[in-house]
Amino acid sequence: MSQVRDTPVKLFGWTITPVSHDPYSSSSHVLPDSSSSSSSSSLSLRPHMMNNQSVTDNTSLKLSSNLNNESKETSENSDDQHSEITTITSEEEKTTELKKPDKILPCPRCNSADTKFCYYNNYNVNQPRHFCRKCQRYWTAGGSMRIVPVGSGRRKNKGWVSSDQYLHITSEDTDNYNSSSTKILSFESSDSLVTERPKHQSNEVKINAEPVSQEPNNFQGLLPPQASPVSPPWPYQYPPNPSFYHMPVYWGCAIPVWSTLDTSTCLGKRTRDETSHETVKESKNAFERTSLLLESQSIKNETSMATNNHVWYPVPMTREKTQEFSFFSNGAETKSSNNRFVPETYLNLQANPAAMARSMNFRESI
């Protein structure tokens, strides 16, 4: 009679085989020696257990090998994918690597072809940055022109105007503004002032002083040249300094040049010291040294004295002429002063021209 066995069951990866058990044999045959029966049953069960263990070991090995193979495959797949991604990115980088454009773009400012490619703005291929060597400017393709020059290269407008680029103004430039011929100093660079000759001869520099009578109305004289730092001339026309100044004339009498007398503005009494006599003597000597303008009146009648024309001419002073013709010193004198010169009264008369005119008329009538 063939024994029917159950199929093995897999549970959690383990295969469980059922144990073959015959109930009829156990119930029908009852042996007195229980020990012999138990030993025989144990011996019969051992080979089944060994078979089960071997089967489970084999299945576990197969499962582990399968898992290892799957992990290897997944790792290989991931490696392949990563390598593919890296190759793709490297290819993209190679393709998108910022290469210099082959075309030379002309400058949009000066239309010159002397340009060069510098870089891509923000690593963008659509914004290449170029530089023009002619106008020293940067610009981006598709963008606007930069006004301020940036970067390397020598700029033409770099720095201030050097000292050797001053304008030279001559008399020809000023003829349009003034009909009279004038001479204006021209400032040159400091390099032109340096010459090989260390000394100047006396015959090289000559200053011609023209007489005053030739230019009665036009004061075109210039001051002698002075040592001053080199600076550019004033861009506007300015009148030159006059060679002399007219002295004011009040009521037909000229006022002489200011002397070194006591020019204090306070009037009234002053303390009489010994120094006052010394100042009087010094002022007398100063008046004798200087040349004064004297008035020559052609008096036809005593009644037409105020309407006559006055002619002025310079006459050098001497001791005899001062006593005869110097009305300035006599204007301050009185009959009781015994020909004594008082500078205070002279200053007072000089400050008041009306009083001076009255004093002159009074002296002429005496």
UniProtKB/Swiss-Prot annotation:
Where are zinc fingers of the kind Dof-type found along the chain?
105-159
The family database entries (PROSITE patterns) matched by this protein are listed as: ZF_DOF_1 (PS01361), ZF_DOF_2 (PS50884)
Instruction: Region Disordered: list its residue ranges.
Output: 22-103
Question: Where, per UniProt, does this protein localize?
Answer: Nucleus
Compositionally biased intervals (Basic and acidic residues): 70-83, 91-103
Annotated binding of Zn(2+), by residue: C107, C110, C132, C135
User: Low complexity composition bias: which ranges?
Assistant: 25-45, 56-69
Asked whether the UniProt record includes tRNA processing among its keywords, one would answer no
Alphabetical list of InterPro entries matching this protein: Dof (IPR045174), Znf_Dof (IPR003851)
Q: Which domain of life is it from?
A: Eukaryota
> What is any one of the record's Gene Ontology cellular component terms?
nucleus
GO molecular function, a single term? DNA-binding transcription factor activity
Q: Which UniProt keywords apply?
A: DNA-binding, Metal-binding, Nucleus, Transcription, Transcription regulation, Zinc, Zinc-finger
Its function?
Answer: Transcription factor that binds specifically to a 5'-AA[AG]G-3' consensus core sequence.
Q: What's the protein called, per UniProt?
A: Dof zinc finger protein DOF1.3
Organism for this UniProt entry: Arabidopsis thaliana (Mouse-ear cress)
- Gene name as annotated: DOF1.3
